[in-house]
């Protein structure tokens, strides 16, 4: 699906969807609690559907010795959270996915599996993992996705003895780990956090069902913050100002970028915010450097490259480095065509940027928003956005 946007200012109120990051964690915790409790305000995004589908597959009866087949869609969280969980509850699993998912690195797990004697093999986009997680010490570098930490934090309490996770280098994505620890605590799981360097997890713990309402998504709210930066008037509702979501930092980064002059923004702890922040940077006075961004190259797209391409296609000035993006501000954009790159965040960033253009903007592959924000185009239209689908 391609969309042609006629530039218009956006005005009104919007409620971002439920937090995808929190929803993944809640769905998994509730499943490990035996399905007791209730879960409300759950996003219907493709990523959450993938986690629910895999949870159901883990519960399905199967012949003795047969591993569950887990289709993770395009969801990195689903895949990385469930690899250790499947080992803990089912002796492993056969994992598959779509898009670039199975190209995304799993080496931190593979290093652990080599040490622990757990089998793994990947052929033609299918990853098979078989073995038993045992209590003990698990080591992870801190400069990789926090999804690896979360997967272990969910699985290790189920083991018959105590375990420790050692973070061997400074942890970059502490906000996402905070979200995990908060959800585990809600479901009765105790973890001792020693300054994000060591996590002590007692074994033989039992997940306890809870009634959970998933709060609004600060990551998706980032696009509406970006809209306001571009002189739109959007009231953003339904967010928890005290949230453990790391992406709530978008509120303070908004004001940092509002100040004229050159600026550096470290996105190691909030990589998903890069596209909307880059749109803000493209129209501000000064040069903005987004640093510590190497992990963005292994998202749904090479997001450093596709964010730069988005801005440059529409008359901006962006240059990618190995782990950075440099954006020089321009007064306005000229319009053009953006390849959505099958990346939901690139599509939404382009739609927001279109409100500052002097000519129509075409976005190719606009349906990618279904991955995380299925109602994005409805919300965009309700706020006064004008577009044609072709």
Please tell me what each predicted stretch does:
Residues 1-390:
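Short, structured segments at the rim of ligand-binding sites
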């Amino acid at each position: 699906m391609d969309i042609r946007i006629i530039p218009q200012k956006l005005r009104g109120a919007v409620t971002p969807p439920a937090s995808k990051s929190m929803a993944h964690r809640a769905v998994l915790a509730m499943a490990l609690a035996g399905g007791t409790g209730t879960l409300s305000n759950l996003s219907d995004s493709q990523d959450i559907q993938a986690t629910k589908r895999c949870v159901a597959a883990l519960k399905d009866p199967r012949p003795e010795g047969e591993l569950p087949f887990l289709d993770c869609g395009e969801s990195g969280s689903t895949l990385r959270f469930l690899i250790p969980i499947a080992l803990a509850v089912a002796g492993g699993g056969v994992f598959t996915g779509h898009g670039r998912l199975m190209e995304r690195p799993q080496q931190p797990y593979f290093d652990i599996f080599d040490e622990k004697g757990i089998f793994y093999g990947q052929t033609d986009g299918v990853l098979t993992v078989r073995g038993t997680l045992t209590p003990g010490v698990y080591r992870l570098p801190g400069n990789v996705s926090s999804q690896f930490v979360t997967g272990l934090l969910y699985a290790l309490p189920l083991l018959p003895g105590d375990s420790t996770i050692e973070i061997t280098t400074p942890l970059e994505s502490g906000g996402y780990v905070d979200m995990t620890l908060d959800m585990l605590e809600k479901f009765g799981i105790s973890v001792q956090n020693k300054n994000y360097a060591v996590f002590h997890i007692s074994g033989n713990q039992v997940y306890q069902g809870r009634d959970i309402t998933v709060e609004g998504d600060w990551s998706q709210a980032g696009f509406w913050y970006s809209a306001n930066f571009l002189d739109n008037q959007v009231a953003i509702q339904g967010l928890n100002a005290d949230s453990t979501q790391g992406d709530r930092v978008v509120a303070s980064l908004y004001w940092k970028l509002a100040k004229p002059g050159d600026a550096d923004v470290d996105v190691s702890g909030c990589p998903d915010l890069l596209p909307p922040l880059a749109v803000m940077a493209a129209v501000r006075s000064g040069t903005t450097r987004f640093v510590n961004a190497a992990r963005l190259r292994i998202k749904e797209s090479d997001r450093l490259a596709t964010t730069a391409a988005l801005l440059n296609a529409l008359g901006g000035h962006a240059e990618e480095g190995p782990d950075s993006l440099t954006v020089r501000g321009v007064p306005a954009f000229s319009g053009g065509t953006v390849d959505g790159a099958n990346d939901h965040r690139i599509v939404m960033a382009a739609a927001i940027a279109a409100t500052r253009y002097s000519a129509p903007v075409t976005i190719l592959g606009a349906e990618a928003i279904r991955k995380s924000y299925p109602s994005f185009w409805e919300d965009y239209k309700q706020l006064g956005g004008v577009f044609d689908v072709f």
